[in-house]
């Protein structure tokens, strides 16, 4: 079986191995495609069934561990959203113009979760599918990199953090320095603002 990175669950090598063992699968190869050719935080691997498997096996984590994990995750997500809202409000208060970068699911859903996403000037996407499109929930216009020539901002918050090196390289062509490009993960952590 070929498995690839899926956005609903963010597996790493360790968690993928543990998860598949519960269903009598063994990892054959994590290096099917060399890391330098994989994009961002993608995880691609191959696994095979063990001999004499019981495919009806449904053992999951004990309920108390599962519910605590999800309760803590929910708490951390809300805390992170509050930190993003503080960041957004603070920058507006001091007159900084901020744009988001990454109109994929992570960027769109995060902005839709914020009560003040309208403080962002727009949302940049390297290759938007068309012009005059807006992110659901936040209503932010999705623009291409060229938009920055006529509409510069002071800071860019990157939601697509797995592509950070590539994004910084692209933004440098438009005059942006590394200190103007922030990862939303860093902002979500406590103590940034």
What does each of the following model-derived ranges do?
Residues 25-36:
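Conserved S-adenosyl-L-methionine
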Residues 38-40:
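Short acidic/glycine-enriched loop/turn segments that link adjacent beta-strands
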Residues 1-9, 13-15, 19:
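Short, glycine-/aromatic-enriched active-site segment of Class I SAM-dependent methyltransferases
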Residues 10, 27-29, 46, 99-100:
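Structured core elements
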Residues 44-193:
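Hydrophobic, well-ordered beta-alpha structural blocks that scaffold small-molecule cofactor pockets
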Residues 21, 25, 51-52:
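Non-catalytic alpha-helical coupling and interface elements of nucleotide-dependent molecular machines
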